[in-house]
Amino acid sequence: QDLSEMPDLGAFYDRTPELDTLTTWILQQHCRLIALTGISGIGKTTLAVQLVQQIKDEFEYVIWWSLYPSPTLTEFQDKLIQFLSQSDNLDSPATNQKPLPLIKYLQKHRCLVVLDDIHSLFSSGELAGKYKPGYENYRSFFKQVEQLSHQSCFLLIGWEQSREIPQTNSQNTPIRTLKITGLDIPAAQEILRDYELAEIENYSALILRYQGNPLWLQTVATLIQELAGCEHEILLDDTILLPERLKNSLHQQLSRLSEIEKQVLSLLAQASEPIKRAKLLQNTLIPPSDLLNALQSLSRRSLIEQQADFYTMPLVVRQYVNSTFT
């Protein structure tokens, strides 16, 4: 195992349905490539750590690496081959063979490879999932992982995923995407309980306002604690607080947006209710094809939500956009 880059689990709040889904995909359906995506702070990495702790004994090799700062594909493959070939040589020290191609190791051994910060491979200032110059060969590598027969699994974690990874799942392919959403109210209440805020009046309103996002709730709960119980004032109206840690988290993700995405987000942020796609398309400043591409990209980033042909965004994102995109 190489789990030296895997974070400590820390506090973990109930994600039983997501854990069950991932476990089924990996151990029963033998999926080869799984994308774990969601907005910053939602708990993707924490969920993956819990998953690894639960299923690591089912694999010969378990590897957790961060792709920050962006190793080239050659560097990444060489490092992975070196790790797996050293393990092989320890098992049979008399052999003095050259390392095999990576796919051969994935076929020979059951490996779980977790790659965090997958968004580090993608360009800033572009629509979601466009590889940076010099990193486009990752596209064909992940396609190989998906299509060639082997007994290993790659779990990709990030705010963005490659454009080639479908957002809808088919039982006929060995590739899956799981978009992580907020905690349900009982699980999110555990966060407030950690901050001695679980019994405040209208705690569910606070959870819903911050959409069950663990990081958002933790930063707001910390602020409430430090201001000695300002929760009553906060809950009196629809105030959305943006503590510095929360703003920094959003900045890291939203600073990567293309200009067209920023325009579309600003349009959505000005509306107090969900906007119909047809109404957005009436905007004469944005060509329809550009607008539709931006909506798709923002949805893939989990920055907007779509219900039928209506679009909206989390209240926290709206507050950030209205205070930042001027």
Where are these regions (language model features)?
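A eukaryote-biased feature capturing mid-to-C-terminal, repeat/solenoid-rich segments of large proteins
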Residues: 229-243, 321-326
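Alpha-helical sensor/transducer elements of the RecA-like P-loop NTPase core
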Residues: 15, 46-47, 75-79, 119, ...
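Hydrophobic, repeat-rich solenoid/adaptor surfaces of innate immune receptors and signaling proteins
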Residues: 15-18, 22, 35-36, 49-52, ...
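C-terminal interaction surface of TIR/SEFIR-family domains
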Residues: 1-4, 10, 16, 247
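C-terminal boundary/linker of central alpha/beta nucleotide-binding cores
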Residues: 48-49, 53, 247-325
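Post-nucleotide-binding-loop coupling segment downstream of the phosphate-binding loop, primarily
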Residues: 9-12, 17-27, 31-126
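Short catalytic/ligand-binding loop motif for oxyanion handling, primarily in non-cytosolic enzymes
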Residues: 43, 72-73, 121-124, 162-166, ...
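Conserved catalytic network of the ASCE P-loop NTPase/AAA+ motor domain
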Residues: 28, 104-108, 144-151, 257
